[in-house]
Amino acid sequence: DHIDLEFDVGQCIQASYTAPTAGRTSVNIVASDGTVVLHVDYRKHSGGKPSTGKPWNQILIINSKLGGSWGTEEKVHDVETTIVYNDYTGCKQDADFSIELNQKDIATYAYRTPVNTVSRVEFGNSGNDAVLRKLCVVYPAPSK
């Protein structure tokens, strides 16, 4: 699922979805040239860590894909979710993305590429049981 849009500093993306019982759920903010400006990927007992081969468990992986290559991942460990409902918000501030899950600030992520080229927001469940409930842009960013 996706929405096409124009997006700039100070605006927010909100995705509401049921969390996966296993697997992955991701929200991508994508530029018109295909650059993934922000990739937020929640993994609940999914895949395997390169260092151990054991599954990722309750981790949020944040990254960007520039020029066809993924950058260095930033990770937030021990991310608690509920099966029934999750609310992800990625807000653009002046210099960083502010990432919330269930109304809790869990990470900031520095811009790696200009954000005014964003034209699309994508939601993916990687074939797992997460279900998108709502995907929208909020103008302007909600005050905290």
UniProtKB/Swiss-Prot annotation:
It comes from the Eukaryota. SMART domains: GLECT (SM00276). One of its GO terms (molecular function) is carbohydrate binding. Residues 1-138 form the Galectin domain. The keyword Flavoprotein does not apply. Keywords: Lectin. Lectin that binds beta-galactoside and a wide array of complex carbohydrates. Tetramer. This is Galectin a. It comes from Aplysina lactuca (Marine sponge).
